[in-house]
């Protein structure tokens, strides 16, 4: 698949099969994150944690359910893996942009490998300052200086989505000057 095909084919999947992702696929996906542009080349300000089995992902889901008070919530929709990007400077806009670039690369790599994906930020961010924060950090085995920013849920989609046509968006315009 070429870059534009991957971009068009990538959709947010919210219904995954409950099975593990092959380690080699996860390694390729993480490798794509490492090619992402990062402001001022501060790669050392970022950390990636891979919850690589459905059992580990289920632990995250349990923490998220406890945090939001909904025993049925599933912010990762049964994904087989969750790849969390953390930063040393979580309150800086650049750190969010860096994490977003890494996550987008991973979402596109997952698509290229025939896997489904979903950008998950809200449930990750909700853990900050919460009663579940210590348990979440322990699950991630996260060094103290890092704070989770966002994540990519990855898995086998129960249904394959057709590539999208170019979206028409009345809110955002494109102006070519000159």
Walk through the language-model features, giving the residues of each.
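Structural motif
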Residues: 80-83, 116-118, 150
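Short, conserved aromatic-histidine micro-motifs
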Residues: 65-66, 133-150
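C-terminal helix-cap and adjacent tail motif
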Residues: 5-6, 12-13, 17-18, 142-178
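Short, charged/polar surface micro-motifs in flexible loops or helix N-caps
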Residues: 53-58, 89-91, 158
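Solvent-exposed alpha-helices and their adjacent loops that cap or buttress functional pockets
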Residues: 40-43, 74-77, 140-146, 165-167
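Small-aliphatic-rich amphipathic alpha-helix that forms the alpha element of a beta-alpha
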Residues: 33, 91-136
């Amino acid at each position: 698949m070429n870059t534009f095909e991957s971009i068009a084919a990538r959709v947010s999947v919210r219904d995954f099969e409950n099975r593990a992702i092959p380690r080699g696929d996860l390694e390729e996906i993480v490798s794509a994150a490492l090619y992402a542009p990062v402001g001022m080349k501060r790669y050392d300000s970022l950390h990636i944690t891979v919850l690589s089995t459905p059992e580990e992902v289920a632990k995250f889901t349990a923490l998220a359910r406890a945090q939001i008070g909904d025993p049925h919530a599933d912010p990762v929709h049964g994904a087989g893996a969750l790849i969390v990007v953390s930063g040393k400077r979580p309150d800086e806009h650049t750190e969010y942009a860096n994490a977003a670039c890494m996550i987008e690369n991973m979402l596109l790599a997952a698509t290229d490998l025939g896997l489904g994906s979903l950008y998950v930020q809200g449930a990750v961010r909700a853990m900050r300052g919460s009663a579940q924060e210590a348990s979440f950090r322990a699950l991630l085995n996260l060094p103290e200086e890092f704070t989770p920013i966002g994540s990519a849920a990855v898995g086998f989609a129960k249904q394959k989505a057709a590539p999208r046509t170019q979206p028409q968006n009345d809110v955002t315009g494109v102006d070519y000057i000159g």
